[in-house]
Amino acid sequence: MMKRENFPVAKIYVPIERRKTLVQARVDEIAASMLKDGQQVPIKVRPDGERFVLIEGLHRLEAAKALGEATVVGYRVDARKH
């Protein structure tokens, strides 16, 4: 079972191809939900040296950034590089 962790937002890298899928309206919806209920669904990241690479949860990560959060809840996963 994966364990929830707090990851520093500043240490999470989002691959360029992934950034192209960002929909600002969705970020705004999630940010509003996070303000009301907190972060409900963790993101997924994989370790990459001193940083982490985002695997899943782009809109949740961007919502946390928009709210000025220093950390985001997530799972550390072992994933292959593409």
Please provide the spans of the model-predicted regions.
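Short, charged recognition helix plus adjacent turn
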Residues: 81-82
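Short, charged/polar connector segments at secondary-structure boundaries
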Residues: 1-78
